[in-house]
Amino acid sequence: MTWHPHANRLKTFLLLVGMSAMIVFFGALFGRTALILAVLFAVGMNVYVYFNSDKLALRAMHAQPVSELQAPAMYRIVRELATSAHQPMPRLYISDTAAPNAFATGRNPRNAAVCCTTGILALLNERELRAVLGHELSHVYNRDILISCIAGALASVITALANMAMWAGMFGGNRDGQNPFALLLVSLLGPIAATVVRMAVSRSREYQADESGAVLTGDPLALASALRKISGGVQLAPLPPEPQLASQAHLMIANPFRAGERIGSLFSTHPPIEDRIRRLEQMARG
């Protein structure tokens, strides 16, 4: 079984550098004061999300904590995987929904939570469930919540500066030699570009979690099988496309919405299931 984590890490790094470059560009348009205000706003908002990510996600999914008596298989699998990775045991939750999915959240391994829906517990066999839980634990061990918040903070700065560009374009006229039409164009394209890059970061982290989760369990084909089942199950029982659920979609192991209910692949939080399965099958072949 081969594993090449460096490509995904490099891609994530380059995407974050690209977002930082966009901020420098916007900062050059508006000067230091506007840049500092935008950065302070974005950092403050995302620090809150970072420290409360578990509460926000669990509340959105109406997840309830479960004991070992209530979910013995889930506890046994997670304990085995955490022990093999020399990591603490996370809190375990179940969300009572037929939509087959799972997610992990929490800012570090000591504050982590893993949640499975009743739909995924009914759909998968134990080998596949182990693979899914390995994927979710890998998100925690790879510090993907932190990476997501960094990407979110950068995107928020770009959006805030783009809003300034919009107002400057509409009401600033030609002051300081600024072209109002150029400012309006930047204000439209900036947030779109930031969102595209942020979603690309999310997709890159999914590939990374697939690979590192498969290494943790030693069974990439089980994860491929689970993803195939989950993809079909989501078409039958998707999550409702509500705003509070859409904001947590990037945490799920697979896109929780039925195909066609969300925007195209550039704006998708997850890579195509077919690509993920193909990569896992290649890992298994070595």
From Swiss-Prot:
One of its GO terms (molecular function) is metalloendopeptidase activity. Its main location: membrane. GO terms for biological process: proteolysis. Its EC number is 3.4.24.-. InterPro entries: HtpX_protease (IPR050083), Pept_M48_protease_HtpX (IPR022919), Peptidase_M48 (IPR001915). Keywords: Cell membrane, Hydrolase, Membrane, Metal-binding, Metalloprotease, Protease, Transmembrane, Transmembrane helix, Zinc. It is found in: Cell membrane. The chain crosses the membrane at residues 13-30, 34-51, 145-165, 181-201. Zn(2+) binds at residues 135, 139, 206. HAMAP family: Pept_M48_protease_HtpX (MF_00188). This is Protease HtpX homolog. The gene is htpX.
